[in-house]
Amino acid sequence: MSKTTQLSFPAADPFILRAVDGRYYLYCTSEDGSGIPIHVSDDLVHWQRCGTAIGKDTARWGVGCFWAPECYEINDKYYLFYSADWKENPTGALENFRIGVAVADDPAGPFADMADKPIFDPGYPIIDADVYTEDGRYYLYYSRCCYEHNVDGLEESWIYGVELKPDFTGVIGEPVLLLRPEQEWEGRSAAATGRRWNEGSYLLKHNRKYYMTYSGNFFAGPDYAVGYATADTPLGPYTKAPENPILERSAQVTGTGHNCMFRTTAGELMICYHGRTEATGNDRIAFISPAHFDEQGRLVIDAE
């Protein structure tokens, strides 16, 4: 694909898996948060709905806000990591999100929760799971929500990483803070919302460097945008790119963010993210654009 493709249906927080059958599966947040839709395509242009991965009718621990799924093929099984509102809420927290994992034999499901509780409880609400594996070890990246996380008078969302147990039943060690809002562009929503965000991380490796893409600003606002940071190890420390943001609003599309990256069957590097247009209104629509690394090792999005 040499140009940006806009999908024809709402697909917030999109994640695309290229499965062993050669087909592409898209998992996303539904606009009402009641479940995680699955779509399938042979060419990244024409898509068909093929099911719901998990939702309030099938989940064992979540009761709503089924958000930000990512699906991975591991040892002939499909593992879906996602965020949801945890039913265990003794304090009545307004944001009680945690991360869980469901498993299936097929990328189209049916998926079933592996446990009746989240993977772990850090003691604060978390969303936006991303999982990276290397040398037999698994790493979970997530976003601590802004909720009740006051930093110098503003609530902030931070990105953490932690090693996962190989059977996904918990974590190993303590989470490590990786990214927090620091660059000027990450505060464009602060005056209107009282919050600053770093969220929606995705990790990939290129030439022995780890590249973490992430989103900044309010997801429902026009200034939602994507930056990246690099590190020499999966758990950092990470240094943000000075050229951030690398994907932001244009005259046609606003609110561009919460991306994943993948390679096509031809080996092309692609980024999938959501955004809004005048025609789509408040619905978040998925876009797929080519991407590449330049001679200096900078990540470049070709979103024309």
Give a label for each model feature.
Residues M1-E304:
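Carbohydrate-active catalytic/glycan-binding domains of CAZyme proteins
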